[in-house]
């Protein structure tokens, strides 16, 4: 079965073709970073309009890459949520219209299930069951995964997600959008020991996260420095390093707890923040001590992409799950509500 995947949940237009026997045949991605940079964040209306301009040309591009035609497509998977409602509707409308014209089925894919399954596209994918750390956009979650659609939420952020905290701290430091990679880059020049940032909610039982306090601590640190002599480049780098280390160590501590609590020995990390090099290093150290394994998607599949949507959609289409041709756009959609592919 050849599945066309369409990702338009936020500020990236991702298109891919996945075949059940041959694997990933082609994928392409257009990022709107430059479009939104002047605004310091994603402008939903601009995002939607840009998806309208890009989806069809990118579909043609992946078809050419794979050497197939529209008539070869067996089904279309598109991101149905969570995400920006206008952006979701663009992808859903194009998917439904094309499917109607071709006489093929569609399926709406959960964006976070796409991220969760992205490591399955690698050469040595993890086996079920495993613990998943999902760190993408407005989500920071720990999930027990026993199969596709078999998800148990172990913990999540009670306020800001890790990615949101990175973006907000980036603004405090005067860094460009998107903030996460910019903070990580600046942190490489900083002194991890200069400031003692808290590790939120690690002093109590449980697997939930909280990052709003770290955001406030960062702001207070910068304000105190400004009042006592000013903020120079060295101090900004030190703040970035200490903030990042606090976020990373907090997530590592929670992942260790999740592995011990579930008794599982496989951990996957997915979502945009999973590309963070420091987080990967610290998780690798942690799982070694736990005699466990950690898996990631390749960097290009950590951020939003069409390949993960095509793959996730294929898993459900292959067992007979289908959508109708109405456009499904669900800005808020709990992952644990998804049905198992076992029926």
Curated annotation (Swiss-Prot):
Principal location: cytoplasm
The protein's Enzyme Commission number: 2.3.1.234
SUPFAM superfamilies: Actin-like ATPase domain
Origin: domain of life: Bacteria
Binding site for substrate: 134-138, 167, 180, 276
InterPro entries: ATPase_NBD, Gcp-like_dom, KAE1/TsaD, TsaD
Keywords: Acyltransferase, Cytoplasm, Iron, Metal-binding, Transferase, tRNA processing
Catalysed reaction equations from the record: L-threonylcarbamoyladenylate + adenosine(37) in tRNA = N(6)-L-threonylcarbamoyladenosine(37) in tRNA + AMP + H(+)
UniProt remark on cofactor binding: Binds 1 Fe(2+) ion per subunit.
GO molecular function list: iron ion binding; N(6)-L-threonylcarbamoyladenine synthase activity
Entry cofactors: Fe(2+)
Enzyme class of the recorded protein, top EC level: transferase
Subcellular location: Cytoplasm
Coiled coil: none
GO biological process, one term: tRNA threonylcarbamoyladenosine modification
Binding site for Fe cation: 111, 115, 304
GO CC annotation, single: cytoplasm
NCBIfam families to which the protein is assigned, alphabetical: gcp_kae1, T6A_TsaD_YgjD
Function field: Required for the formation of a threonylcarbamoyl group on adenosine at position 37 (t(6)A37) in tRNAs that read codons beginning with adenine. Is involved in the transfer of the threonylcarbamoyl moiety of threonylcarbamoyl-AMP (TC-AMP) to the N6 group of A37, together with TsaE and TsaB. TsaD likely plays a direct catalytic role in this reaction.
HAMAP family attached to this UniProt entry: TsaD
Family the UniProt entry places it in: Belongs to the KAE1 / TsaD family.
Protein name: tRNA N6-adenosine threonylcarbamoyltransferase
Species this chain originates from: Hahella chejuensis (strain KCTC 2396)
């Amino acid at each position: 079965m050849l599945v066309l995947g369409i990702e338009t949940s936020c500020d990236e237009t991702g298109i891919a073709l996945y075949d059940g026997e041959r694997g990933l045949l082609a994928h392409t991605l257009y990022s709107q970073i430059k479009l939104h940079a002047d605004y310091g964040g994603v402008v939903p209306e601009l995002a939607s309009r840009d998806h309208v301009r890009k989806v069809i040309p990118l579909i043609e591009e992946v078809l050419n890459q794979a050497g197939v035609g529209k008539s070869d497509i067996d089904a279309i998977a598109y991101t149905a949520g969570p995400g920006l409602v206008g952006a979701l509707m663009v992808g859903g409308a194009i998917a439904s219209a094309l499917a109607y014209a071709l006489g093929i089925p569609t399926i709406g894919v959960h964006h976070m299930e796409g991220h969760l399954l992205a490591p399955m596209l690698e050469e040595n994918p993890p086996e079920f069951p495993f613990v998943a750390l999902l760190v993408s956009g407005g989500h920071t979650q720990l999930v027990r995964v026993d199969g596709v659609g078999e998800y148990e939420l172990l913990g999540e952020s009670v306020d800001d997600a890790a990615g949101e905290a990175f973006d907000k701290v980036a603004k405090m430091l005067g860094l460009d959008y998107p903030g996460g990679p910019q903070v990580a880059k600046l942190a490489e020049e900083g002194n991890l020991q200069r400031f003692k940032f808290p590790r939120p909610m690690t002093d109590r039982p449980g697997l939930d996260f909280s990052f709003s306090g770290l955001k406030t601590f960062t702001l207070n640190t910068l304000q105190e420095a400004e009042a006592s002599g000013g903020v120079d480049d060295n101090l900004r780098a030190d703040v970035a390093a200490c903030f990042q280390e606090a976020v990373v160590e907090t997530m590592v501590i929670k992942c260790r707890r999740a592995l011990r609590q579930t008794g599982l020995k496989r951990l996957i990390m997915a979502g945009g923040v999973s590309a963070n090099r420091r987080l990967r290093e610290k998780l690798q150290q942690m799982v070694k001590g736990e005699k466990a394994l950690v898996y990631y998607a390749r960097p290009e599949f950590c951020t939003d992409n069409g390949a993960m949507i095509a793959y996730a959609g294929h898993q459900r289409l292959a067992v007979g799950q289908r959508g109708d041709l109405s456009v499904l756009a669900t800005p808020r959609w709990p992952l644990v509500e998804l049905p198992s592919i076992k029926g």
